[in-house]
């Protein structure tokens, strides 16, 4: 259905242009986009907690736009810029980005108190939380968001 959503979440290792599985397996972002673009829903959201995850846009060069590459239906929220690490915390049991996404979806990102979390609200919360927690490190982390503006007001969760 048109209102359905696909949510893809990856937390693990990353390198420029790809997420990294176990062993020598690489899954390039362009392959993720290619597979997800075939879905009928126009609402696809990918969360990537991996080093260099901001490199998802590296293939979107001057010859085409991100919207053309994704059919204007995929939004990526990435843990870091293309040249940054994505930090983990052993006491949290996951990365700062994953932790912020979870806290945000559980209500912390509800900026206007309407008991709904939109993509824009979640990103604003995640960005503030992660940059604050990593600002004193040698390599601060800056989450990234790219996708069609029509996705920014899509409600990801409500209660």
Model-derived features: positions:
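Cysteine endopeptidase catalytic domains of the caspase/legumain-like
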Residues: 1-159
């Amino acid at each position: 259905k048109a209102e359905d959503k696909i949510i893809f979440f990856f937390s693990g290792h990353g390198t420029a242009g790809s997420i990294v599985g176990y062993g020598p397996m690489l899954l390039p972002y362009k392959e993720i986009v290619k597979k997800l673009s075939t879905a009928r829903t126009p609402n696809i959201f990918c969360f990537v907690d991996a080093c260099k995850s901001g490199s998802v846009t590296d293939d979107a060069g001057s010859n085409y736009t991100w919207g053309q590459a994704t059919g204007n239906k995929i939004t990526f929220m990435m843990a870091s810029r293309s040249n940054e690490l994505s930090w983990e915390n052993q006491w949290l049991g996951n990365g700062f980005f994953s932790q912020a996404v979870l806290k945000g979806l559980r209500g912390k990102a509800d900026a206007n108190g309407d008991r709904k979390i939109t993509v824009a609200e979640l990103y604003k919360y995640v960005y503030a939380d992660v940059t604050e927690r990593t600002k004193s490190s040698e390599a601060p982390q800056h989450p990234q968001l790219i996708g069609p503006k029509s996705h920014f007001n899509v409600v990801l969760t409500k209660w």
